[in-house]
Amino acid sequence: MAKNPKILSIVLAGGEGTRLMPLTRDRAKPAVPFGGVYRLIDFPLSNLVNSGYRQVVVLTQYKSHSLDRHISQVWRFSPLLGSYVSPVPAQQRLGKHWYLGSADAIYQTINIIEDVQPDIVVIVGADHVYRMDFEQMVQQHIESGAEFTVAGIRQPIEESNQFGVIEVDHDHPNMIKNFQEKPANTTGLPDNPNQILASMGNYVANTKALFEALSLDEKAADTKHDMGGDIAPYFASRNEAGVYDFNSNEIPGSTATDHAYWRDVGTIKQFYDAHMDLIAYVPEFNLYNQDWPIYTMSGNLPPAKFVHAGRDRLGHATDSIVSPGVIVSGGEVHHSVLSPNVRIHSWAQIVDSVLFDGVIINRRARVYKAILDKNVVLTENSTVGIDTEHDLARGFTVTPDGITVVPKNTIVDD
């Protein structure tokens, strides 16, 4: 391995995101807005760029127009310096079909890897919220001698059926003894039976070994063509898979509260809970860490504005994130996230909610524990999240946890 290996990063952004419906009705999951001004794709891309990796390929597939547009507008580098973030749609180079899985997505674009000729390929997912210095993971990968390294994080054992589960070789703690993808039953860690070591869906691989594994997987009869379900177990079975403990990753500017923060936001509840993490007095994930910034489009929007100061008509927001272009005009906002260009009119109430761009809440309307997609309009005195049966009757999504989701461009008129 060269002292300064050539590295290509691949972001797997082709997931359909069915569990996030209706937020993914009109967009790819990585293009879903998050945290007021960001999109989910901004988190892995920011981590790669902050790690010094600026040759990035983003593999897209379903409903990718808004994702492609966001990447082309925000993630532009100078080609003179050899830097790029390049969206690559499904090519159908080796068969007239969509990607059959994450491993097949990489195999179908293997010509791009061959053109770059990297020593190492860094592979990351596009639907998690976290900060990570991938350079630290790459250095451990090189030092360990592994052909393939998986990033691992501790998770509750009751969630083992949602993750790839890593069993570490106790004689060689940086190596994987066994890897199971989403097992129905498993055992906990030796030092904590209530936890497992879960795969984060981030991988580092030596290029030659990765090519060999992908080629074998493509020809195999019993495969789902999945990085976690097939490629990781393949390397583990050959004693060639390492594990990187995410808890050891050090980020400049991080605090004890948000150290090693990582959230899968693949369901409505996870997506909602991750937003609530942002707005605590001491947030579990600190968006304001400028030593490791999350990049996105800044836009040409004016500052947020709060107007009316009457005793019963005070425009204000507490324990909330308020984005540029927002006007709170005599309404009340509490414990919520307001995206750009939201309008809150007099005597309206927004509590425990997430409002995407361009939402308009008219007078005396009320929103509680809800996610409102772009350009939703609530007419005067209308409600969302107050009456579950009424919300369901109007065709809104209501989760078992009581989170109401209103689709894009809906006019809510009670």
From Swiss-Prot:
Homotetramer. It comes from Bifidobacterium longum subsp. infantis (strain ATCC 15697 / DSM 20088 / JCM 1222 / NCTC 11817 / S12). This is Glucose-1-phosphate adenylyltransferase. It catalyses: alpha-D-glucose 1-phosphate + ATP + H(+) = ADP-alpha-D-glucose + diphosphate. One of its GO terms (molecular function) is ATP binding. The keyword Nucleotide-binding applies. Keywords: ATP-binding, Carbohydrate metabolism, Glycogen biosynthesis, Glycogen metabolism, Nucleotide-binding, Nucleotidyltransferase, Transferase. It comes from the Bacteria. Gene3D superfamilies: Hexapeptide repeat proteins, Spore Coat Polysaccharide Biosynthesis Protein SpsA, Chain A. Pathway: Glycan biosynthesis; glycogen biosynthesis. CDD domains: ADP_Glucose_PP (cd02508), LbH_G1P_AT_C (cd04651). Alpha-D-glucose 1-phosphate binds at Y99, G164, E181, K182, S199. Its EC number is 2.7.7.27.
